[in-house]
Swiss-Prot record:
Keywords: Cytoplasm. One of its GO terms (biological process) is signal transduction. Its main location: cytoplasm. The keyword Nucleotide-binding does not apply. PP2A consists of a common heteromeric enzyme, composed of a catalytic subunit (subunits C), a constant regulatory subunit (subunit A), and a variety of regulatory subunits such as subunits B (the R2/B/PR55/B55, R3/B''/PR72/PR130/PR59 and R5/B'/B56 families). Coiled coil: none annotated. This is Serine/threonine protein phosphatase 2A 57 kDa regulatory subunit B' epsilon isoform. The gene is B'EPSILON. GO terms for cellular component: cytoplasm; protein phosphatase type 2A complex. GO terms for molecular function: protein phosphatase regulator activity. Residues 12-71 are annotated as: Disordered. Residues 23-34 have a biased composition (Low complexity).
Length: 497
């Protein structure tokens, strides 16, 4: 029965192939299998067609199996269900279905190709269920055709962001606030990603066999897709890549290195934040699995690739994931606390108050995991910066800095180094008490000042005495300066007369 179906299918294939070959000859100068509306850096699949193509067929990927059914252009047609054929016929039918799903449907208009779209959707759903079922045995040839179909669907040129077009964006337009571009053919693309995910996590798939298809090239092109503006696609990519990292141990160094290279490219070339948050989320789980003592390679990437991410203007998009990664490093190896804190101070924002609030929140998380021995190494530059934050005219910055004293672990570290810290921030607290415009900041400063007084009265009095002496000297210097200017003005008036 199945052989009859195959023969009938071949006849249809031959007729259709001749028809489409004639069309291809007539339109040879105008056809293309890449997206033409401006592409980004993602490498297109050699056999994929544009998302906006209105044809019902697509060129099949190269290196197709040497079977008669795969020598023709795939056509979307109804095939028997996998569960309705014998186990011996199932592999060939599976490959035919996978080959058929290499076609791309036109989603630019909902009225175009409704039947073909539904056939492909139902076929993809069946393949997903087949891999998920206990009977879903997939041999090496089937895996090859499956990954070829996945590649033909997901690897494509991505449309450029609005601000990347040659025309200048409207005045005041912020690329970070643009509405993301949503893939119109997501109903199919989602199922392809689900199929890939089922393949990767399947216990029936041996890594030694799958590495022939999930190789460095495949992983590299998968990483390129993190530049997609569609958040749904990036979420699937994050899950798939994380599963690949967990299952394919021999790919782990390559994946880590590739992620760091994307960070380098973002920092020094594109400054495009899309996908950085998802990559950092993957990296956070990776760091959590590092062994202690940490290898020098990981320390180097922390300094060269992760900490510099703090200097980006678009840090608010991925700061939560970045802070988690940084904190994970300190929790894994407490000796990295000094490196991390000095890195934060190096990239501390000077004019962006909202970014400064983010830094203070991250600093608290890092200090919460810092040991006293590491804290002592950076206490002076750290509290010099905190003192500046205490006196910030932006009340949110000043408040966030004062909230550090609500953390018991940080208060304990301060108490152990009070001889160094008190003189640094005492002046900042006094200035807030006397002249800060925000009442909440005024009250918080008073609470911290009282805490210092209770912690060490004698040291507090010494700092207060030193502060009053410095204020007196400053007043005296100001009077001398005013007197000097007055004398210069008088001398200038006499000379003019």
């Amino acid at each position: 029965m199945f052989n009859k179906i195959i023969k009938l299918g071949q006849k249809k294939f031959n007729k259709s192939d001749q028809h489409h070959q004639d069309n291809n000859n007539n339109n040879n100068n105008t056809s293309t299998n890449t997206v033409v509306r401006g592409s980004r850096t993602t490498t297109p699949a050699p056999s994929s067609v544009s998302n906006g193509e209105s044809q019902t067929t697509a060129q099949s990927p190269s290196q197709t199996p040497n079977h008669p059914m795969f020598t023709t252009t795939p056509i979307l047609e109804v095939l028997p269900l996998l569960k309705d054929v014998s186990s011996s016929d199932r592999p060939l039918l599976f490959m035919k279905k996978a080959h058929m799903c290499s076609c791309h449907c036109d989603f630019s208009d909902t009225l175009i190709m409704p039947r073909e779209k539904e056939i492909k959707r139902q076929t993809l759903l069946e393949l997903v269920d087949f891999l998920h079922s206990s009977s879903g045995k997939v041999n090496e040839t089937m895996q090859s055709e499956l990954i070829r179909m996945v590649s033909a669907n997901i690897f494509r040129c991505l449309p450029p962001a609005y601000h990347e077009n040659t025309g200048a964006p409207p005045e005041g337009n912020d690329p970070e606030e643009e509405e993301p571009y949503l893939e119109p053919w997501w109903p199919h693309l989602q199922l392809v990603y689900e199929l890939l995910l089922r393949y990767v996590v399947s216990s029936e798939i041996e890594p030694k066999t799958a590495k022939k298809f999930i190789n460095h090239t495949f992983v590299s092109r998968l990483l390129d897709l993190f530049d997609s503006e569609d958040p749904r696609e990036r979420e699937y990519l994050k899950t798939v890549l994380h599963r690949i990292y967990g299952k394919f141990i021999f790919h782990r160094p390559f994946i880590r290195c590739s992620i760091y290279n994307i960070f380098y490219k973002f920092l020094y070339e594109t400054e495009r934040c899309i996908g950085i948050g998802e990559l950092l989320e993957i990296l956070g789980s990776v760091i959590n699995g590092f062994t202690v003592p940490m290898r020098e390679e990981h320390r180097l990437y922390l300094v060269k690739a992760i900490l510099p991410l703090h200097k980006s203007k678009g840090i608010s998009i991925y700061h939560q994931q970045l802070a988690y990664c940084v904190t994970q490093f300190v929790e894994k190896d407490y000796k990295l606390a000094d490196t991390v804190i000095r890195g934060l101070l190096k990239f501390w924002p000077l004019t962006n108050c909202q970014k400064e609030v983010l830094f203070l929140g991250e600093l608290e998380e890092v200090l919460d995991a810092t040991e006293p021995s590491e804290f002592q190494q950076c206490v002076v530059p750290l509290f010099t910066q905190i003192g500046k934050c205490l006196n910030s005219a932006h009340f949110q910055v000043a408040e966030r800095a004062l909230f550090l004293w609500n953390n018991e672990h940080i208060v304990g570290l301060i108490a152990q180094n009070k001889d160094v810290i008190f003189p640094i921030i005492f002046e900042a607290l006094e200035r807030n008490m006397k002249g800060h415009w925000n009442q909440a900041v005024h009250g918080l400063s008073e609470n911290v000042r009282r805490m210092f007084l209770e912690m060490d009265t004698e040291l507090f009095e010494e700092c207060e005495k030193q502060y009053l002496e410095n204020e007196a000297k400053a007043c005296e210097l100001l009077e001398q300066r005013e007197l000097t200017w007055k004398r210069l003005e008088e001398a200038a008036s006499l000379a003019a007369n």
